[in-house]
Amino acid sequence: MRKLPSGRYQAVPMELNAYQDAARSTAAYPHVGQNPIYPTLGLTGEAGEVADKVKKVLRDREGVFDPEAREAIKLELGDVLWYVAQLARELGYDLEEVASANLDKLVSRVARGRISGSGDHR
């Protein structure tokens, strides 16, 4: 992400940790650095907004994700990502560490034939 003279950001290939650092510079909530509750609540709210936009595509657009709907969902996904980045940082994790651990878990499940089903420790 590159900041333009206009103050807007331009998308460029970036590492997750670079995103997390840039996102942190915009964090303005109570007790930043020692408050995992705020980003957790924000994350659930934003995930709900994603679900609501998808629901409205089903209800109002016959399930067609046209460019307008896709753009609206993209913006909400960005908000989800922002809160994931904040929560990870509040818990002492870099986003790349979280992403790597997630892929390791999924690859292990595939290798053991346990990708389907439920439960954290399958």
Regions found by a protein language model. Name each.
Residues 1-122:
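Flexible "arm" and connector segments at domain edges
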